[in-house]
Curated annotation (Swiss-Prot):
This is SHC SH2 domain-binding protein 1. The gene is Shcbp1. It comes from the Eukaryota. The keyword Cell membrane does not apply. The lineage of its organism: Eukaryota, Metazoa, Chordata, Craniata, Vertebrata. It is found in: Midbody; Cytoplasm, Cytoskeleton, Spindle. It comes from Mus musculus. SMART domains: PbH1. Keywords: Acetylation, Cytoplasm, Cytoskeleton, Phosphoprotein, Repeat.
Length: 668
């Protein structure tokens, strides 16, 4: 009934959750009501709430059966739940103490008897009277109210069935299934809000395996806060829809595997024999445990907002390209909101005069941009005439086509409006985009995502809102003479196994300039990056950020010592060769940078050198790893991996006025 009850109702005065008396005495000399009515919360995010104060409403449910007014509590804001769990319910408890703290909180708030509630299930609703509360089990002892008010969604499920069900449950109902009925005095609003916090916690926050997690630091910081933030991020369309589906699937898989693990562990504990079947069960249990741990790590990756941003969401694009036409013909698509004679004459003069000397080419005209792109086959060209084009869906480019703006980028503007995950999706083998300005609004993911193949971006302007250009694994980006700005994430995200060439671009006023996701994952190669004559400036964080594991940093600590050892220990030919290679690389790079360096070693040269030093550290780390593997007899399969370099060419880049500097690392 709760869903139906939220459809409408009569507003009533607000009520607040009382704090735990012991915490109130320690933290706030004022009354708990004064504390909860404060207008600001230092722990809350700016975008999570609009109005202060935890409020509850009452409503008269709409339906055939005249149920009494219930207290509505499902519309609480992020910071209201945050404060309740942090300050009044869980505080700094451990996972093993969650039940104890919850019971203690409810004992201070709930009346043990004398209140009514609507027992809500997926099948029926019935009015009950609470005669007692069994706090340790989080259940209420109830009886059917007099007069009995009952409504069922199934005609076959009668009031007699409800009475039978109550008998089976021994009249003990979970508090989460009860919706408190209001009276004119509003004295039960606090109880309703307390039950709502418990209901929400066990539905959206608590996991059955939490008690078996590490219990050394407080549960709120480790689990409650990230899961609560994820819930509201999803609610406010901050998370890609595909990632939401993945998260719920992972959660279901983990719950199912954990259930199997508990059953298996229970059967083993009841078995005293050392039989072959028991040994098989133990192996199965170890496999289940390993699977559960992997699933839990994936869940934590999504729940943590920072890691969710750093690692991103690798969506699998299911869009299939059409390929070439059966007759092999290529078509030129002209997109213009209005076609006038002057524009048509200029277009034919500038664009089609050379084509007239060749074989005949078909030309199609479109007033809608997406229809023009969707009509393309391999080898087609889309010419976009000056104008402001508004799209409400995703521009999916699955074939090798060319998207060409006829004029200056500021004259050909494509603006994304309406909520959605992505703006431009590229999966074609060879996509070319030039002379266009893209403006992003309300998207969850980047303004341009390259999933597969090569995309060339030239003379374009990208006004971002979330992330700029994302280059996924196995994809390739060649970007030249383009401008990327305004991203709340990184201007450019480069994934492992991708290739990225950046020449003469501006990347500015983003959270980070370029984010390189070098996970050192065994399944991926490192990205290959060339950066030439780019201007990376006025970004909130670093100009370039490299993501790498902590173990990577540990291996780097003795890099300089390793170089010195290689130069001294000349009797070891392999070490001498490795040292010379690195020395030659440093000299080569230094010679390339010489024209850009000044007496005071300006910021431009410093930024390039910081990236080059990272290159040398990566090379040395690989050399050390190769040497260790060689000592173990592993040489053949590793040669190709160890010979790769992340930065192919770094020169002439300018780093100016970036908040944290030119180059930084994110360790995980």
């Amino acid at each position: 009934m709760a869903d139906d009850l939220r459809a409408g109702g009569v507003l009533e005065p607000i009520a607040m959750v009382p704090p735990r008396p012991d915490l109130a005495a320690e933290k706030e000399p004022a009354s708990w009501k004064e504390g909860l009515f404060l207008d600001a919360d230092p722990c809350s995010d700016q975008g999570y709430h609009a109005n202060p104060g935890a409020t509850v409403k009452t409503l008269i449910p709409e339906g055939k059966t005249p149920f009494p007014r219930i207290i509505q509590t499902n519309e609480l804001l992020f910071y209201e739940r945050f404060r309740a769990y942090q300050d009044y319910i869980l505080a700094d408890c451990k996972a093993s103490e969650v039940k104890e703290f919850t019971v203690s909180f409810l004992e201070k708030v709930l009346e043990p008897s004398g209140w009514w509630a609507v027992w809500h299930t997926n099948v029926f609703e019935v009015l009950v009277e609470v005669t007692n509360v069994d706090f340790p089990s989080l259940k209420a002892v109830v009886r059917l109210a007099e007069p009995c008010i009952y409504e069922s969604k199934l005609s076959t499920f009668t009031l007699a069935n409800v009475k039978e069900l109550l008998d089976l449950k021994e009249f003990h109902l979970p508090l989460q299934e009860l919706w408190v009925v209001s009276d004119d005095s509003h004295e039960f609003h606090q109880m309703a809000l307390a039950i709502e916090h418990v209901r929400f916690f066990y539905k959206h926050i608590w996991r059955s395996w939490d008690e078996e997690e590490e219990d050394e630091y407080d549960y709120f910081v480790r689990c409650v806060e990230p899961r609560l933030r994820l819930y509201y991020d999803i609610l406010e369309d901050r998370v890609p829809s595909g990632l939401i589906v993945d998260y719920h699937n992972l959660l279901s898989q983990c719950e199912e595997s954990y259930r199997k693990f508990l059953n298996l562990r229970s059967s083993l504990s009841n078995c005293n024999s050392d039989s072959e079947q028991e040994n098989i069960s133990m192996v199965e249990g170890l496999n289940l445990y390993s699977e559960i741990e992997q699933l839990k790590q994936k869940l934590k990756l999504i729940e943590n907002p920072l890691l969710r941003y750093v690692f991103g969401y690798q969506k699998n694009s299911n869009i299939q390209g059409k390929g070439t036409r059966q007759n092999g013909q290529k078509v030129i698509h002209v997109v213009s909101s209005t076609m006038k004679t002057g524009l048509l004459r200029s277009l034919f003069k500038d664009r089609f005069c050379e084509e007239s000397c060749k074989e005949e080419t078909e030309i199609k005209f479109h007033s809608d941009l997406l229809s023009g792109i969707n009509a393309c086959y391999d080898g087609d060209t889309v010419i976009i005439c000056p104008g402001h084009y508004v799209v409400h869906g995703t521009c999916s480019i699955a074939d090798s086509i060319e998207l060409e703006g006829y004029g200056l980028p500021d004259d050909i503007v494509i603006e994304k409006r309406g909520k959605g995950d992505t703006f431009v999706d590229c999966t074609g083998m060879d996509v070319k985009i030039s002379g266009i300005k893209f403006i992003q609004h309300d998207s969850v993911e980047g303004i341009l995502i390259i999933h597969h193949g090569k995309t060339t971006l030239e003379n374009c302007v990208l006004q971002c809102e979330t992330t700029g250009v994302t280059v996924r694994t196995s994809a390739e980006l060649f970007m030249k003479n383009s401008d990327v700005y305004g991203a709340k994430g990184a201007g450019i995200e480069i994934y492992p196994g991708s290739k990225c060439t950046l020449t003469d671009n501006g990347i500015h006023h983003c959270k980070e300039g370029i984010l390189i996701k070098d996970f050192l994952d065994e399944h991926y190669d490192i990205p290959k990056i060339s950066m030439i004559n780019n201007v990376i400036h006025n970004n909130e964080g670093y100009g370039v950020v490299l993501v790498k594991p902590t173990i990577f940093c540990d291996l780097q600590e003795n890099t300089q010592d390793e170089i010195n050892d290689n130069m001294v220990q000349k009797n070891k030919e392999a070490d001498v060769t490795e040292g010379l290679d690195l020395e030659e690389m440093l000299q080569c790079v230094a010679s390339k940078m010489e024209p850009y360096a000044t007496a005071d070693f300006n910021e431009q040269a410093k930024g390039n050198c910081e990236i080059i030093n990272e290159l040398l550290a990566i090379s040395m780390q690989k050399g050390r790893m190769k040497k260790r593997l060689s000592e173990l007899g592993i040489t053949q399969a590793d040669d190709n991996i160890m010979s790769q370099e992340m930065f192919i060419e770094i020169m002439g880049n300018q780093f100016k006025w970036n908040g944290k500097g030119s180059f930084g690392t994110f360790l995980y």
